[in-house]
Amino acid sequence: MERVGAGELPETLRLARPGAMVAFAKQDAVAEGYGPAARAAREHGFQPILRLAGGRAAVFHEGTMALAHAIPDHDPRPGIQRRFEQSAELVARALRRLGVDARVGGVPGEYCPGGYSVNVAGERKLAGIGQRLIKDAAHVGAVVVATGEERIRDVLVPVYEALGLSWRPATAGSAGTPLDELQAALSAEYAELYELVEWRLDEKTLALARRHRAEHLAG
């Protein structure tokens, strides 16, 4: 995102398969129960990290797809809602390609609640979307759950209890589709809007990521 904002890279989309992490938001990090919540994550085999954007703690694991879209924009604030709407609908369309009854909107009692969550049949959350703005760029981040909703429930029950947050574990869902198929569907939807050119992270970008790593390590 920083390199896109600086004009060093063009608009960039990254689809990644993360390890097991609980991504805490800034307001989680200042909560009284943050320490116990981070310990609960570790006890369940999840690395606690601090996230770039989003409202409350969310989960990444090997059955999820992480999406990061860095967009150059000299005045990013007026476009916040448009980016949310476009990104949420794009994820929903990708899931519908796979036969999922995907809809945009929050589910009552969902974890990390948001108006631009993507759900299945209005009942279970499949994806969450967040944004971060910097000078001359916006970052849209999302996590889409392909499989393994039970792992989300198992770790977030103690994590949210420690943070003093209420939620309904039954709202955690998954698309029930292989990651390869989910990645292909997401790529196909982005290809409808953009000319996609495959690119691998270069050394300058990796070095920048290493410098920022400590900022995202949870206590």
Task: Give the role of each language-model region.
Residues 98-100, 129-132, 136-219:
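Long, positively charged amphipathic alpha-helical accessory segments at protein N-termini or as interdomain linkers
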Residues 1-52, 192:
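N-terminal low-complexity, intrinsically disordered segments
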Residues 18, 62, 120-123, 134-135, ...:
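Short acidic-glycine loop/turn motifs at beta-strand connectors
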Residues 52-58:
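Short glycine-enriched loops at secondary-structure junctions
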